[in-house]
Structure formats: C-alpha cells, structure tokens
Amino acid sequence: ACKTKFEISETPLSSIPVLCPNCGSLARPHIVWFGESYDESLIQEAVSFLRQCDVLLVIGTSGMVSMPGFLTEQAFRAQRIELNPEPSGITPLVQISIRAKAAEAMPLFWERLNAG
C-alpha cells in the first residue's frame, strides 16, 4: 500500500471494497489498530504540541491502552479536561472530569467556548 490519504466521501459506496485511487490496493482508515505501532515521528510531533498547549480536551477514551494516558501526561502545563460518560484510566490525570456523552455535551461546550 502506498499510504495515499483521501476522503472516503470521494468514493461512491457502490465501489466496495474501497480501493486506493493511487495504487489500487485496499484502502484502510487512517487509524492505528490494536497490535499496530504508532509512527514515532507523529508521536514526537504530538508530544511537542501537547507540552505547549494551554487546554487539552480528552473525549471518549477508556484509557485502557497506554497511548491516551501517555499523551495526556505530556500536556503537563495544560488544563486537562476529560469528557466521558464513565470514569476512565484518564480520570486521575485530569483536573476536570465531565460525566456526559460527547454527542450531548459537545454542543454545549462549543456554545460556551464561542460565547467568550
């Protein structure tokens, strides 16, 4: 696979399985599956960003895999907020935990954020 990135909306659903428009191989989502490793350069880029951010909003993770916790810890100067219906492995790492579903809470969050 050539790792070409493209929007799935550009591909008609009638052409399933979705193939890469560049090389013709099976397309896959731009995510890391369980058992796969992360691209080290992307991790370093994320860590650099997180160490400089003011606010980190962590939405909907169980925290049962190590990377979300590791990345949350890297935002050590930031106000860390968790949005999750249940306590998670991230809960001890944040200053604020909001117990709600993202679909319900995010519209209110954005409304307040945009209000100033």
Walk through the language-model features, giving the residues of each:
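Conserved catalytic alpha/beta core of Sir2/sirtuin-type deacylases, generalized to analogous enzyme cores
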Residues: 1-116
